[in-house]
Amino acid sequence: LECDAFCHEKFFHIYLRNANSQLLVMRPDSDDAGFENVTDHEIKKDTGMNFDMHYYKTTKPSEGMPVAFSVKVDDKNYYMCCEEESGKMIVRFKEGQVPKDISGDSNIIFFKREFNSTKEFKFEYSLEQGMFLAFEPEGIYRKLILKKLSREDEVDETTKIRI
């Protein structure tokens, strides 16, 4: 038996937008992220808007490309992870770098899957089948969350993320 392992392969600088064309912005003061109305002209480097999507090779075949996300804010690097809090899985950002090699399960890996085009995707959390990155309204923006879908082929616009 071979355990799951991930080896960092490459990364790309990207912007993540939801179905409403809002841009994902990470706020280090709250260690979370949300989708906000930001125009292309308002995007600034190292302000939590420009993410890196890290691709990993895996020893186990999977449905979707294993990826992790990181972002730089004020010369500090943060990586996206998922943690349980009060019985609910939440998306967090922690200071540090994504690892080059991961042996076993990891709370930073998501499986990138096509949503309905080559630029729109959904990202399934690697540790819980059927849990996807999504957004929900919270105050003036839409907070990045993990959302359980009842069926894998369910079309849910809140899980659609454009790169």
Segments from the language model and where they lie:
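Lectin-like carbohydrate-binding module/patch detector with strong preference for beta-trefoil
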Residues: 1-163
